[in-house]
Amino acid sequence: MQDFVIVVDAQYDFMATDGALSVAGADALVGPMRAWLSGLESERTAGVLFTFDTHVPDIYAASEEAREFPAHCVKGTPGWANMLDPALLDRAIPAWRIEKHVFDMWAEDGLLIEDARGDAMPPVPRDAFFDRLKDAGVRRVTVIGVAADYCVRWAVAGLVARGFQVVVPAALTRGIARQIDTVLAEDFPGAAVDTVA
């Protein structure tokens, strides 16, 4: 049985020490994340989805999120760029991307999951994409990225709600105020979510 992988918001503004909303310790994850992705095997991996936190200045300024965090991940800027190139993956592993405008990748209607390599695979509506994964026998999703207590937490919540088992490698995520062990203990007691080293 194959697993699926979601890489949450591994973007410059979060991962780099001089990013607009740098997550403490995230810069140290870049090398291990690249090595981990490079080591995925196509026989065991149904695909990898890269999420992109994506903002437009005028819209962001009026958002709830702007009350808590400074502007970050403005589309088309260096801070929006993914620090993990899909070329790291075995070519036989499908690579996908989704742009979201809020913490929760499940909250917005109409989001499309698109090919991350430019291979001209047609976009797929988000919910239909995950339905297809389940129909194909995918039961477990591994989630890595930042921030553990925001966008990673919401990614996990949506997966659990859709019946997936979730695994979060603790060494491949960092939080802002809470780390993943605390997030899972406080927010997902009894859920099908585990951390691994």
Residue locations for each model-derived region?
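Extreme N-terminal starter segment of soluble prokaryotic enzymes
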Residues: 1-5
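Generic enzyme active-site microenvironment
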Residues: 6-7, 11, 51, 98, ...
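Short, glycine/acidic-enriched loop or turn micro-motifs at the edges of active sites
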Residues: 12, 56, 148, 174
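Acidic/histidine-rich helix-loop elements
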Residues: 15-25
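Active-site alpha/beta core segments
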Residues: 31-140
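Histidine-anchored nucleotide/phosphate-binding helix
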Residues: 33-40, 150-161
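Short acidic-hydrophobic, aromatic-tinged amphipathic segments that line or gate anion-handling sites
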Residues: 98, 190-197
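A short glycine-rich beta-strand->turn/loop micro-motif centered on a GG-aromatic cluster
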Residues: 142-145, 164-178
